[in-house]
Amino acid sequence: MNRFLIAIDGPAGSGKSSVAKLVAQKMNMNYLDTGAMYRAVALYLHSKGLSAKDDLKKHLAEIDIEYIDGELYLNKKKVSDEIRSSEAGKLASDFATIPAVRERLTQIQRHICQNGKFVVEGRDIGTVVLPEADVKIFLTASFKERVRRRFEELKAKNMNLTMEDIADQIKIRDRQDSSRSIAPLKPAEDAIVIDTTSKDINEVADEICQIAFRRIKVEDNCC
């Protein structure tokens, strides 16, 4: 099997990144974080003095994104660390509403995944970017748990935000993601929904791996 795709979708704080990385590791597959791409592009456009109201097509055409040894590079510059700030998340939500931005990044993501085996995580992966994915997972968690996870993540990076700050940010992000006219956040019709509230990442990753192994077996038997 030369190509196999696992799409992992879900709202902020549902565990997408941690789970997707572990699934990729367990299954010896490549890992692709599409949310990181949006953050990188948003910071790049913002650094150019551009906003969501500007004509971005020329600047988007100049963008090249690569994953090298698990690190994200934009136009040959490593950006893996700076994209994890709260500012990057807010900017990403703003720019993600722009059709030209989504079109360009969807094009890049599809190109990266056209050959090989990938675990791809982010918003609208199973519905828009890779509707042909072999396995589609939509992760959920309670609002309280999502806030707690985000707080612990940022605290580990010495970012000084309160639980209230993070709760407000996630509320705004949820509202933007679910109400946007272009690719609103929702599970694909054939996605398997997993509530991660009371599960650790190993439990969730193992569950997804078992789903994937069953799918691989079915596809092998069909060939």
Swiss-Prot record:
Keyword field: ATP-binding, Cytoplasm, Kinase, Nucleotide-binding, Transferase
Gene Ontology BP annotations: nucleobase-containing small molecule interconversion; pyrimidine nucleotide metabolic process
Subcellular location: Cytoplasm
Gene: cmk
Cellular component terms (Gene Ontology): cytosol
Stored CDD domains: CMPK (cd02020)
Catalytic activity of the protein: CMP + ATP = CDP + ADP; dCMP + ATP = dCDP + ADP
Signal sequence interval, chain numbering: none
Residues reported to bind ATP: G10, P11, A12, G13, S14, G15, K16, S17, S18
Residue ranges that the Swiss-Prot or TrEMBL entry lists as coiled coil: none
Protein name: Cytidylate kinase
E.C. no: 2.7.4.25
Keyword field contains Nucleotide-binding: yes
Gene3D superfamilies: P-loop containing nucleotide triphosphate hydrolases (3.40.50.300)
InterPro entries: Cytidylate_kin, Cytidylate_kinase_dom, P-loop_NTPase
One Pfam family it belongs to: Cytidylate_kin
GO molecular function annotation: ATP binding; CMP kinase activity; dCMP kinase activity
Domain of life (superkingdom): Bacteria
Assigned protein family: Belongs to the cytidylate kinase family. Type 1 subfamily.
